[in-house]
Amino acid sequence: MYRSHFIADVTPEYDGKEVIWAGWVHLLRDLGGKKFIILRDKTGLGQVVVDKNSSAFGISQELTQESVIQVRGIVKADKRAPRGIELHAEEITLLSKAKAPLPLDVSGKVKADIDTRLRERVLDLRRQEMQAVIKIQSLALKAFRETLYKEGFIEIFTPKIIASATEGGAQLFPVIYFGKEAFLAQSPQLYKELMAGVVERVFEVAPAWRAEESDTPFHLAEFISMDVEMAFADYNDVMQLLEKILHNIVKTIKEEGKEELKILNYEPPEVKIPIKRLKYTEAIEILRSKGYNIKFGDDIGTPELRILNEELKEDLYFIVDWPSDARPFYTKSKSENPELSESFDLIYKFLEIVSGSTRNHKREVLEEALKKKGLKPESFEFFLKWFDYGMPPHAGFGMGLARLMVMLTGIQSVKEIVPFPRDKKRLTP
Protein backbone atom coordinates (compact mmCIF):
# COMPACT_ATOMS: atom_id res chain seq x y z
CA MET A 1 0.00 0.00 0.00
CA TYR A 2 1.52 3.29 -1.11
CA ARG A 3 -0.85 5.54 0.88
CA SER A 4 -3.54 5.30 3.53
CA HIS A 5 -5.01 8.77 2.94
CA PHE A 6 -4.95 11.63 0.48
CA ILE A 7 -3.51 14.82 1.95
CA ALA A 8 -6.83 16.70 2.00
CA ASP A 9 -8.56 13.85 3.82
CA VAL A 10 -6.39 14.24 6.93
CA THR A 11 -7.92 16.74 9.37
CA PRO A 12 -7.07 17.86 12.95
CA GLU A 13 -9.34 15.03 14.17
CA TYR A 14 -6.53 12.64 13.10
CA ASP A 15 -4.24 14.09 15.80
CA GLY A 16 -1.97 11.34 17.14
CA LYS A 17 -2.86 8.82 14.45
CA GLU A 18 -0.50 7.20 11.96
CA VAL A 19 -1.11 7.83 8.27
CA ILE A 20 0.78 7.26 5.04
CA TRP A 21 0.97 9.97 2.39
CA ALA A 22 2.41 9.69 -1.11
CA GLY A 23 3.13 12.45 -3.59
CA TRP A 24 5.62 14.94 -5.00
CA VAL A 25 8.07 17.12 -3.07
CA HIS A 26 6.67 20.58 -3.80
CA LEU A 27 9.07 22.59 -1.61
CA LEU A 28 11.90 21.88 0.83
CA ARG A 29 13.00 24.01 3.78
CA ASP A 30 15.62 23.62 6.54
CA LEU A 31 14.76 25.31 9.81
CA GLY A 32 16.35 24.94 13.20
CA GLY A 33 17.54 21.38 12.83
CA LYS A 34 14.29 20.26 11.21
CA LYS A 35 13.44 19.55 7.62
CA PHE A 36 10.10 20.79 6.30
CA ILE A 37 8.69 19.14 3.20
CA ILE A 38 5.65 20.54 1.44
CA LEU A 39 4.16 17.44 -0.16
CA ARG A 40 1.70 17.59 -3.05
CA ASP A 41 -0.85 15.07 -4.25
CA LYS A 42 -3.96 15.42 -6.40
CA THR A 43 -5.90 16.89 -3.47
CA GLY A 44 -3.47 19.66 -2.55
CA LEU A 45 -0.52 20.46 -0.29
CA GLY A 46 0.43 19.11 3.13
CA GLN A 47 3.34 19.77 5.48
CA VAL A 48 5.74 17.03 6.54
CA VAL A 49 8.16 17.65 9.42
CA VAL A 50 11.35 15.60 9.70
CA ASP A 51 13.11 15.92 13.07
CA LYS A 52 16.90 15.68 13.14
CA ASN A 53 16.79 12.62 15.39
CA SER A 54 14.21 10.85 13.17
CA SER A 55 15.32 7.80 11.20
CA ALA A 56 13.84 9.55 8.16
CA PHE A 57 16.20 12.54 8.43
CA GLY A 58 19.03 10.96 6.44
CA ILE A 59 16.97 10.28 3.34
CA SER A 60 15.30 13.68 3.60
CA GLN A 61 18.72 15.20 2.87
CA GLU A 62 18.73 13.48 -0.53
CA LEU A 63 15.37 14.83 -1.68
CA THR A 64 14.94 17.23 -4.59
CA GLN A 65 11.93 19.22 -5.76
CA GLU A 66 9.44 17.00 -7.65
CA SER A 67 10.89 13.76 -6.29
CA VAL A 68 8.16 11.23 -5.57
CA ILE A 69 8.07 9.95 -2.00
CA GLN A 70 6.02 7.94 0.45
CA VAL A 71 5.84 9.23 4.03
CA ARG A 72 4.68 7.28 7.07
CA GLY A 73 4.20 9.42 10.14
CA ILE A 74 2.11 10.69 13.04
CA VAL A 75 -0.42 13.48 12.56
CA LYS A 76 -0.09 16.50 14.84
CA ALA A 77 -2.74 19.21 14.93
CA ASP A 78 -1.16 22.65 14.52
CA LYS A 79 -3.15 25.76 13.63
CA ARG A 80 -0.06 27.33 12.06
CA ALA A 81 0.34 24.51 9.52
CA PRO A 82 -1.46 24.20 6.17
CA ARG A 83 -4.87 22.56 6.74
CA GLY A 84 -4.27 22.81 10.50
CA ILE A 85 -2.12 19.66 10.66
CA GLU A 86 1.37 18.45 9.92
CA LEU A 87 2.74 14.95 9.51
CA HIS A 88 5.78 14.12 11.62
CA ALA A 89 7.73 11.65 9.52
CA GLU A 90 8.88 8.34 10.93
CA GLU A 91 9.79 6.78 7.59
CA ILE A 92 10.37 8.22 4.11
CA THR A 93 10.69 6.07 1.00
CA LEU A 94 12.14 7.68 -2.11
CA LEU A 95 10.11 6.25 -5.00
CA SER A 96 11.50 8.38 -7.84
CA LYS A 97 14.21 11.03 -7.62
CA ALA A 98 13.84 14.14 -9.79
CA LYS A 99 16.80 15.73 -11.55
CA ALA A 100 17.97 19.10 -10.27
CA PRO A 101 17.68 21.85 -11.20
CA LEU A 102 14.20 21.69 -12.69
CA PRO A 103 13.71 23.27 -16.14
CA LEU A 104 10.52 24.88 -14.77
CA ASP A 105 9.59 25.86 -11.23
CA VAL A 106 6.43 23.93 -10.30
CA SER A 107 5.93 25.93 -7.10
CA GLY A 108 5.28 29.06 -9.18
CA LYS A 109 7.84 31.19 -7.37
CA VAL A 110 9.75 31.69 -10.62
CA LYS A 111 7.46 32.61 -13.53
CA ALA A 112 7.99 31.12 -16.99
CA ASP A 113 6.93 32.36 -20.43
CA ILE A 114 4.38 30.44 -22.48
CA ASP A 115 6.96 28.82 -24.78
CA THR A 116 8.90 27.45 -21.80
CA ARG A 117 5.67 26.26 -20.21
CA LEU A 118 4.58 24.40 -23.33
CA ARG A 119 8.06 22.92 -23.86
CA GLU A 120 8.28 21.70 -20.24
CA ARG A 121 4.58 20.89 -20.25
CA VAL A 122 4.33 18.00 -17.78
CA LEU A 123 6.07 20.05 -15.09
CA ASP A 124 3.84 23.00 -15.98
CA LEU A 125 0.72 20.83 -15.64
CA ARG A 126 1.80 19.91 -12.11
CA ARG A 127 1.45 23.53 -11.03
CA GLN A 128 -1.58 24.06 -8.82
CA GLU A 129 -3.14 26.49 -11.30
CA MET A 130 -3.00 23.98 -14.13
CA GLN A 131 -4.29 21.16 -11.94
CA ALA A 132 -7.21 23.44 -11.08
CA VAL A 133 -7.91 23.93 -14.80
CA ILE A 134 -7.85 20.17 -15.42
CA LYS A 135 -10.26 19.54 -12.54
CA ILE A 136 -12.65 22.32 -13.63
CA GLN A 137 -12.70 20.85 -17.13
CA SER A 138 -13.62 17.46 -15.68
CA LEU A 139 -16.47 19.04 -13.70
CA ALA A 140 -17.71 20.84 -16.83
CA LEU A 141 -17.84 17.59 -18.79
CA LYS A 142 -19.55 15.82 -15.90
CA ALA A 143 -22.28 18.49 -15.76
CA PHE A 144 -22.63 18.48 -19.57
CA ARG A 145 -23.19 14.73 -19.62
CA GLU A 146 -25.47 14.67 -16.58
CA THR A 147 -27.73 17.40 -18.00
CA LEU A 148 -28.09 15.58 -21.30
CA TYR A 149 -28.71 12.19 -19.69
CA LYS A 150 -31.51 13.79 -17.64
CA GLU A 151 -32.99 15.18 -20.87
CA GLY A 152 -33.08 11.70 -22.41
CA PHE A 153 -29.98 11.96 -24.62
CA ILE A 154 -27.78 9.03 -25.61
CA GLU A 155 -23.99 9.29 -25.86
CA ILE A 156 -22.62 8.18 -29.22
CA PHE A 157 -19.28 7.85 -31.01
CA THR A 158 -18.91 8.74 -34.67
CA PRO A 159 -16.11 7.98 -37.19
CA LYS A 160 -13.03 10.17 -37.06
CA ILE A 161 -11.64 8.91 -40.38
CA ILE A 162 -13.97 10.13 -43.10
CA ALA A 163 -14.22 10.02 -46.90
CA SER A 164 -15.14 13.66 -47.59
CA ALA A 165 -15.29 17.06 -45.94
CA THR A 166 -18.18 17.54 -43.52
CA GLU A 167 -18.72 21.09 -44.67
CA GLY A 168 -16.89 21.10 -47.98
CA GLY A 169 -14.05 23.15 -46.53
CA ALA A 170 -10.35 23.05 -47.33
CA GLN A 171 -9.12 22.84 -43.72
CA LEU A 172 -8.70 19.07 -43.80
CA PHE A 173 -5.90 16.78 -42.69
CA PRO A 174 -5.49 14.00 -45.29
CA VAL A 175 -4.54 10.49 -44.17
CA ILE A 176 -3.74 7.35 -46.16
CA TYR A 177 -6.42 4.76 -45.49
CA PHE A 178 -5.42 1.36 -46.94
CA GLY A 179 -4.09 3.02 -50.08
CA LYS A 180 -6.98 5.48 -50.39
CA GLU A 181 -7.12 9.14 -49.43
CA ALA A 182 -9.23 9.86 -46.38
CA PHE A 183 -9.44 12.75 -43.91
CA LEU A 184 -9.53 13.41 -40.18
CA ALA A 185 -13.02 14.57 -39.20
CA GLN A 186 -13.52 18.32 -38.77
CA SER A 187 -16.80 17.61 -37.01
CA PRO A 188 -19.21 14.73 -36.31
CA GLN A 189 -21.93 16.78 -38.02
CA LEU A 190 -23.25 14.43 -40.69
CA TYR A 191 -23.03 11.29 -38.58
CA LYS A 192 -24.69 12.86 -35.56
CA GLU A 193 -27.55 13.97 -37.83
CA LEU A 194 -27.95 10.41 -39.07
CA MET A 195 -27.94 9.14 -35.48
CA ALA A 196 -30.64 11.67 -34.55
CA GLY A 197 -32.67 9.89 -37.22
CA VAL A 198 -32.17 6.67 -35.26
CA VAL A 199 -32.47 7.38 -31.52
CA GLU A 200 -33.65 11.03 -31.67
CA ARG A 201 -31.44 12.64 -29.02
CA VAL A 202 -27.67 12.18 -29.19
CA PHE A 203 -24.47 13.79 -27.98
CA GLU A 204 -20.76 13.20 -28.37
CA VAL A 205 -17.59 14.46 -26.71
CA ALA A 206 -14.64 13.75 -29.00
CA PRO A 207 -11.62 15.22 -30.79
CA ALA A 208 -11.91 17.00 -34.13
CA TRP A 209 -9.24 18.37 -36.43
CA ARG A 210 -8.91 21.48 -38.58
CA ALA A 211 -5.82 22.46 -40.59
CA GLU A 212 -6.06 25.83 -38.88
CA GLU A 213 -3.72 28.51 -40.25
CA SER A 214 -4.79 31.13 -37.69
CA ASP A 215 -2.13 31.58 -35.02
CA THR A 216 -4.25 33.16 -32.31
CA PRO A 217 -4.83 32.40 -28.62
CA PHE A 218 -8.19 30.82 -29.56
CA HIS A 219 -7.38 28.46 -32.46
CA LEU A 220 -5.97 24.93 -32.42
CA ALA A 221 -5.53 22.22 -35.06
CA GLU A 222 -6.90 19.57 -32.68
CA PHE A 223 -9.72 20.29 -30.26
CA ILE A 224 -12.44 18.61 -28.23
CA SER A 225 -15.91 19.18 -29.64
CA MET A 226 -19.05 18.80 -27.51
CA ASP A 227 -21.83 18.00 -29.97
CA VAL A 228 -25.58 17.69 -29.55
CA GLU A 229 -28.27 16.72 -32.07
CA MET A 230 -31.99 16.55 -31.35
CA ALA A 231 -34.83 15.19 -33.52
CA PHE A 232 -38.24 16.88 -33.62
CA ALA A 233 -36.63 20.19 -32.67
CA ASP A 234 -35.65 23.54 -34.15
CA TYR A 235 -32.94 26.03 -33.26
CA ASN A 236 -35.05 27.63 -30.53
CA ASP A 237 -35.39 24.26 -28.80
CA VAL A 238 -31.65 23.61 -28.82
CA MET A 239 -30.85 27.16 -27.67
CA GLN A 240 -33.09 26.54 -24.64
CA LEU A 241 -31.32 23.23 -24.03
CA LEU A 242 -27.94 24.95 -24.32
CA GLU A 243 -28.99 27.54 -21.73
CA LYS A 244 -29.85 24.74 -19.32
CA ILE A 245 -26.54 22.97 -19.99
CA LEU A 246 -24.46 26.10 -19.39
CA HIS A 247 -26.41 27.00 -16.26
CA ASN A 248 -25.77 23.53 -14.84
CA ILE A 249 -22.09 23.57 -15.80
CA VAL A 250 -21.46 26.89 -14.02
CA LYS A 251 -23.55 25.81 -11.02
CA THR A 252 -21.60 22.53 -10.70
CA ILE A 253 -18.24 24.28 -10.90
CA LYS A 254 -19.21 26.88 -8.31
CA GLU A 255 -20.47 24.18 -5.94
CA GLU A 256 -17.87 21.44 -6.48
CA GLY A 257 -14.87 23.45 -7.70
CA LYS A 258 -14.60 26.07 -4.95
CA GLU A 259 -10.96 25.21 -4.15
CA GLU A 260 -9.98 25.26 -7.83
CA LEU A 261 -11.65 28.63 -8.43
CA LYS A 262 -9.89 29.96 -5.33
CA ILE A 263 -6.53 28.84 -6.73
CA LEU A 264 -7.32 30.59 -10.03
CA ASN A 265 -8.76 33.64 -8.22
CA TYR A 266 -11.67 33.60 -10.65
CA GLU A 267 -15.44 33.43 -10.63
CA PRO A 268 -17.30 32.25 -13.78
CA PRO A 269 -20.11 34.52 -15.00
CA GLU A 270 -23.69 33.77 -14.04
CA VAL A 271 -25.79 32.25 -16.82
CA LYS A 272 -28.95 34.34 -16.88
CA ILE A 273 -31.83 32.52 -18.56
CA PRO A 274 -32.98 33.41 -21.13
CA ILE A 275 -29.65 34.45 -22.65
CA LYS A 276 -30.07 37.60 -24.76
CA ARG A 277 -30.77 36.98 -28.44
CA LEU A 278 -29.50 39.52 -30.97
CA LYS A 279 -30.47 39.14 -34.62
CA TYR A 280 -27.65 39.24 -37.15
CA THR A 281 -29.31 42.21 -38.88
CA GLU A 282 -29.50 44.06 -35.53
CA ALA A 283 -25.81 43.35 -34.91
CA ILE A 284 -24.96 44.79 -38.32
CA GLU A 285 -26.95 47.96 -37.55
CA ILE A 286 -25.15 48.44 -34.22
CA LEU A 287 -21.77 48.04 -35.90
CA ARG A 288 -22.67 50.45 -38.70
CA SER A 289 -23.74 53.02 -36.10
CA LYS A 290 -20.24 52.67 -34.61
CA GLY A 291 -18.60 53.42 -37.95
CA TYR A 292 -17.90 49.89 -39.15
CA ASN A 293 -18.19 49.35 -42.91
CA ILE A 294 -19.96 46.01 -42.69
CA LYS A 295 -22.50 44.70 -45.16
CA PHE A 296 -25.12 41.96 -45.10
CA GLY A 297 -23.41 38.59 -45.47
CA ASP A 298 -20.13 39.64 -43.88
CA ASP A 299 -18.79 37.66 -40.96
CA ILE A 300 -18.63 39.34 -37.56
CA GLY A 301 -15.02 39.12 -36.36
CA THR A 302 -13.36 39.60 -33.00
CA PRO A 303 -13.04 43.43 -33.15
CA GLU A 304 -16.74 43.69 -34.02
CA LEU A 305 -17.73 41.25 -31.28
CA ARG A 306 -15.85 43.37 -28.74
CA ILE A 307 -17.98 46.35 -29.77
CA LEU A 308 -21.19 44.31 -29.45
CA ASN A 309 -20.10 43.11 -26.01
CA GLU A 310 -19.60 46.71 -24.89
CA GLU A 311 -22.94 47.83 -26.34
CA LEU A 312 -25.01 44.92 -25.00
CA LYS A 313 -23.30 44.91 -21.59
CA GLU A 314 -23.80 41.14 -21.55
CA ASP A 315 -21.01 38.57 -21.22
CA LEU A 316 -23.15 35.88 -22.89
CA TYR A 317 -25.37 36.51 -25.88
CA PHE A 318 -26.71 34.73 -28.96
CA ILE A 319 -26.39 36.14 -32.47
CA VAL A 320 -29.27 34.51 -34.35
CA ASP A 321 -30.66 34.31 -37.90
CA TRP A 322 -27.40 34.49 -39.84
CA PRO A 323 -27.42 34.87 -43.65
CA SER A 324 -28.06 31.51 -45.31
CA ASP A 325 -25.06 31.96 -47.62
CA ALA A 326 -22.77 32.31 -44.60
CA ARG A 327 -23.77 28.95 -43.07
CA PRO A 328 -23.05 25.32 -44.05
CA PHE A 329 -25.26 23.48 -46.55
CA TYR A 330 -27.13 21.52 -43.88
CA THR A 331 -28.47 24.72 -42.26
CA LYS A 332 -32.18 25.39 -42.78
CA SER A 333 -33.25 28.73 -44.28
CA LYS A 334 -36.13 30.64 -42.72
CA SER A 335 -39.37 29.96 -44.59
CA GLU A 336 -40.50 33.60 -44.41
CA ASN A 337 -37.11 34.94 -45.62
CA PRO A 338 -34.80 32.38 -47.31
CA GLU A 339 -31.90 34.86 -47.23
CA LEU A 340 -31.75 34.21 -43.48
CA SER A 341 -31.20 30.90 -41.71
CA GLU A 342 -32.45 29.31 -38.51
CA SER A 343 -29.01 29.50 -36.94
CA PHE A 344 -27.14 30.90 -33.96
CA ASP A 345 -23.74 31.51 -32.46
CA LEU A 346 -23.29 31.81 -28.70
CA ILE A 347 -20.74 34.49 -27.88
CA TYR A 348 -18.82 34.90 -24.63
CA LYS A 349 -17.70 38.54 -24.62
CA PHE A 350 -15.91 38.47 -28.00
CA LEU A 351 -15.41 34.73 -28.46
CA GLU A 352 -17.69 32.32 -30.31
CA ILE A 353 -18.02 29.21 -28.14
CA VAL A 354 -21.06 27.48 -29.70
CA SER A 355 -22.55 27.33 -33.18
CA GLY A 356 -25.84 25.65 -34.06
CA SER A 357 -28.91 25.59 -36.25
CA THR A 358 -32.04 23.88 -37.44
CA ARG A 359 -30.96 21.36 -40.09
CA ASN A 360 -32.36 20.67 -43.53
CA HIS A 361 -34.18 17.34 -43.31
CA LYS A 362 -35.36 16.98 -46.92
CA ARG A 363 -33.09 15.43 -49.53
CA GLU A 364 -34.03 17.74 -52.40
CA VAL A 365 -33.33 20.81 -50.25
CA LEU A 366 -29.94 19.42 -49.23
CA GLU A 367 -29.01 18.67 -52.83
CA GLU A 368 -29.85 22.21 -53.91
CA ALA A 369 -27.91 23.63 -50.96
CA LEU A 370 -24.85 21.54 -51.89
CA LYS A 371 -24.96 22.73 -55.49
CA LYS A 372 -25.28 26.33 -54.33
CA LYS A 373 -22.10 25.88 -52.29
CA GLY A 374 -20.30 24.46 -55.34
CA LEU A 375 -20.30 20.93 -53.91
CA LYS A 376 -21.28 17.72 -55.69
CA PRO A 377 -24.30 15.89 -54.20
CA GLU A 378 -22.86 12.56 -55.39
CA SER A 379 -19.88 13.10 -53.06
CA PHE A 380 -22.36 13.14 -50.16
CA GLU A 381 -24.48 10.17 -51.24
CA PHE A 382 -23.40 8.23 -48.11
CA PHE A 383 -25.25 10.93 -46.16
CA LEU A 384 -28.07 11.90 -48.52
CA LYS A 385 -29.40 8.39 -49.19
CA TRP A 386 -30.77 8.08 -45.66
CA PHE A 387 -32.98 11.11 -46.20
CA ASP A 388 -35.01 8.88 -48.55
CA TYR A 389 -36.12 6.78 -45.59
CA GLY A 390 -37.82 9.16 -43.18
CA MET A 391 -35.52 11.75 -41.60
CA PRO A 392 -37.25 13.80 -38.88
CA PRO A 393 -36.87 17.57 -38.47
CA HIS A 394 -33.83 18.10 -36.27
CA ALA A 395 -31.46 20.69 -34.84
CA GLY A 396 -28.20 20.75 -32.95
CA PHE A 397 -25.01 22.52 -32.02
CA GLY A 398 -21.29 22.10 -31.49
CA MET A 399 -19.38 23.62 -28.57
CA GLY A 400 -15.61 23.91 -28.30
CA LEU A 401 -14.48 22.64 -24.91
CA ALA A 402 -11.30 24.74 -24.77
CA ARG A 403 -13.20 27.92 -25.63
CA LEU A 404 -15.83 27.10 -23.03
CA MET A 405 -12.96 26.78 -20.55
CA VAL A 406 -11.92 30.37 -21.31
CA MET A 407 -15.27 31.37 -19.82
CA LEU A 408 -14.99 28.93 -16.91
CA THR A 409 -11.39 29.71 -15.86
CA GLY A 410 -10.66 33.23 -17.09
CA ILE A 411 -7.52 32.02 -18.88
CA GLN A 412 -7.27 33.92 -22.16
CA SER A 413 -5.54 31.30 -24.30
CA VAL A 414 -6.71 27.83 -25.27
CA LYS A 415 -3.04 26.87 -25.65
CA GLU A 416 -2.63 27.29 -21.90
CA ILE A 417 -5.86 25.41 -21.17
CA VAL A 418 -5.34 22.30 -23.34
CA PRO A 419 -2.80 19.95 -21.69
CA PHE A 420 -0.92 19.18 -24.92
CA PRO A 421 -1.99 21.74 -27.56
CA ARG A 422 -1.58 21.13 -31.28
CA ASP A 423 -1.06 24.10 -33.58
CA LYS A 424 1.13 24.92 -36.60
CA LYS A 425 4.24 24.99 -34.40
CA ARG A 426 3.64 22.10 -32.01
CA LEU A 427 3.45 18.36 -32.55
CA THR A 428 5.22 17.48 -29.27
CA PRO A 429 5.05 16.96 -26.36
UniProtKB/Swiss-Prot annotation:
User: Which segments cross the bilayer?
Assistant: none
Q: How is the cofactor bound?
A: Binds 3 Mg(2+) cations per subunit. The strongest magnesium site (Mg1) is bound to the beta- and gamma-phosphates of ATP and four water molecules complete its coordination sphere.
Q: Which Pfam families does the UniProt entry name for this protein? A: tRNA-synt_2 (PF00152), tRNA_anti-codon (PF01336)
Site features described as Important for tRNA non-discrimination, chain residue numbers: P82
- Which keywords accompany this UniProt record? Aminoacyl-tRNA synthetase, ATP-binding, Cytoplasm, Ligase, Magnesium, Metal-binding, Nucleotide-binding, Protein biosynthesis
Q: Where in the cell is it found?
A: Cytoplasm
This entry's Enzyme Commission designation comes to 6.1.1.23
Q: How does it assemble?
A: Homodimer.
Matching PANTHER family: ASPARTATE--TRNA LIGASE, CYTOPLASMIC (PTHR43450:SF1), ASPARTYL-TRNA SYNTHETASE (PTHR43450)
Protein name per the record: Aspartate--tRNA(Asp/Asn) ligase
User: What organism is listed for this UniProt entry?
Assistant: Sulfurisphaera tokodaii (strain DSM 16993 / JCM 10545 / NBRC 100140 / 7)
**Gene symbol?**
aspS
